[in-house]
UniProtKB/Swiss-Prot annotation:
HAMAP family: TsaD (MF_01445). Its cofactor is Fe(2+). Keywords: Acyltransferase, Cytoplasm, Iron, Metal-binding, Transferase, tRNA processing. Substrate binds at residues 134-138, 167, 180, 276. Required for the formation of a threonylcarbamoyl group on adenosine at position 37 (t(6)A37) in tRNAs that read codons beginning with adenine. Is involved in the transfer of the threonylcarbamoyl moiety of threonylcarbamoyl-AMP (TC-AMP) to the N6 group of A37, together with TsaE and TsaB. TsaD likely plays a direct catalytic role in this reaction. This is tRNA N6-adenosine threonylcarbamoyltransferase. The gene is tsaD.
């Protein structure tokens, strides 16, 4: 089965073609970072308009690169949520229109399920069951995964997601957008131990997260430095390192708890923050000590992309699941409500 995947949940337009027997045939992505950078964050209306502009050229590019024509497409998968409603509607409308014109089924895919399954595109994919850490701009969750659609939420952020905290903190200390890569870049030049930030909610039982207080702690630290006349680039680097270390160690502590609680040895990390090298290194060391294994997608499949949507959609289509012709999206959509495959 050849499935065309469309991703338009936020500020990246992704298109990919996945073959159930041959794997990923082609993928293309357009990032709107430059469009939104001047505003310091994503502007939903601009995101939707740019998806409209980019979608068809990217589809043509993927078809050309794969050597396929519309007649070779067996189904279409699209991100149906969660995400920005206008952006989601662009992808859903395009998918349903092409499905009708080409006479093929369409299926809406949960954006975070796409992220969770992205490591399945690698040469050594994880095997069920495993614990998944989903870390992105909109989500920070620990999930027990027993199969596709068989998800048990173990813990989640009660306020800011980890990726959101990175972006907001970067803005507070005068860094550019997107904040995650900026903080990671500065942290490489930071002085270890100059600042020590708290590890939120690690002093109590449970698997939930909270990063809002850490963001405020970082701002207060920066403001004290500025008032003391120490707003140098090195101070920014030192604060960036302290913040990143606090977030990473908080995630590590919670992941260790989740693995011990479930008795599982394999961990999947997915979502945009999973590309952070400090997080990857920390988890690899921890899982090595626990005689387990950590899995993640290649960096370009950590952020939003069409390949993960094509793959996730293909699994549900092979199980006989597909949508009717109505155009419907779900800006808020709990992943544990998905049917099992």
């Amino acid at each position: 089965m050849r499935v065309l995947g469309l991703e338009t949940s936020c500020d990246e337009t992704g298109v990919a073609l996945y073959d159930s027997e041959r794997g990923l045939l082609a993928d293309a992505l357009f990032s709107q970072i430059d469009l939104h950078r001047v505003y310091g964050g994503v502007v939903p209306e601009l995101a939707s308009r740019d998806h409209v502009k980019r979608m068809l050229p990217l589809i043509r590019q993927v078809l050309d690169e794969s050597g396929c024509t519309p007649a070779d497409i067996d189904a279409i998968a699209y991100t149906a949520g969660p995400g920005l409603v206008g952006a989601l509607l662009v992808g859903a409308s395009c998918a349903q229109a092409m499905a009708f014109a080409w006479g093929v089924p369409a299926v809406g895919v949960h954006h975070m399920e796409g992220h969770l399954l992205a490591p399945m595109l690698e040469e050594q994919p994880p095997r069920f069951p495993f614990v998944a850490l989903l870390v992105s701009g909109g989500h920070t969750q620990l999930v027990r995964v027993d199969g596709i659609g068989r998800y048990q939420l173990l813990g989640e952020s009660v306020d800011d997601a980890a990726g959101e905290a990175f972006d907001k903190t970067a803005k507070l200390i005068g860094l550019g957008y997107p904040g995650g890569p900026e903080i990671a870049r500065l942290a490489e030049r930071g002085t270890p131990g100059r600042f020590v930030f708290p590890r939120p909610m690690t002093d109590r039982p449970g698997l939930d997260f909270s990063f809002s207080g850490l963001k405020t702690f970082t701002l207060n630290t920066w403001q004290r430095c500025v008032e003391a006349g120490d707003d140098s680039e090195q101070t920014r680097c030192d604060i960036a390192l302290a913040f990143q270390t606090a977030v990473v160690e908080t995630l590590l502590i919670k992941c260790r708890r989740a693995l011990k609680q479930t008795g599982l040895k394999n961990l999947v990390i997915a979502g945009g923050v999973s590309a952070n090298q400090a997080l990857r290194s920390g988890l690899e060391k921890m899982l090595g000590e626990m005689k387990g294994q950590v899995f993640y997608a290649r960096p370009r499949f950590c952020t939003d992309n069409g390949a993960m949507i094509a793959y996730a959609g293909c699994q549900r289509l092979l199980a006989g699941q597909h949508d009717g012709p109505a155009i419907s999206v779900q800006p808020r959509w709990p992943m544990e409500s998905l049917p099992a495959v």
